[in-house]
Swiss-Prot record:
Record protein name field: Universal stress protein B homolog
UniProt organism field: Vibrio cholerae serotype O1 (strain ATCC 39315 / El Tor Inaba N16961)
Bilayer-spanning residue ranges: 6-25, 89-106
Subcellular location: Cell inner membrane
Keywords: Cell inner membrane, Cell membrane, Membrane, Transmembrane, Transmembrane helix
UniProt entry tagged with the keyword Magnesium: no
Secretion signal span: none
Annotated family: Belongs to the universal stress protein B family.
């Protein structure tokens, strides 16, 4: 029989991998955003997005942009595809984080 620690370790590993995928996709989205949508790049502080002094309100602006799917009106299919990917990975990573936390408290 599989122990609870093994299940928790496997969940943590899957969660860590998906969070890494999300951060990588977010970095590439911000890189593409510089060319495809310069105004949004400036609004979300693209250059300082991943720095320690990054402005949280500007990061929340990108969250709301992706949440409300405003990117569907954009003309660049690469940009809209990347936005879809980042949105899906954010939902997946968030769900896995919640699930892993619940399982950790149950064990």
């Amino acid at each position: 029989m599989i122990s609870g620690d093994t299940i928790l370790f496997a969940l943590m590993l899957v969660t860590a991998i998906n969070v890494a995928r999300y951060v990588t996709a977010l970095r590439s989205l911000i890189y593409i955003m510089r060319e495809a949508h310069p105004l949004l790049y400036q609004q979300v502080d693209g250059r300082g997005f991943f720095t320690t002094h990054g402005n949280v309100t500007k990061q929340v602006r990108l969250y709301h942009y992706l949440k409300s799917r405003e990117y569907h009106h954009h003309h660049d299919p690469v940009f809209t595809g990347k936005c879809d990917r980042v949105r899906e990975l954010f939902i997946l990573s968030g769900s896995l984080l919640v699930l892993t936390t619940v399982v950790a408290f149950m064990l």
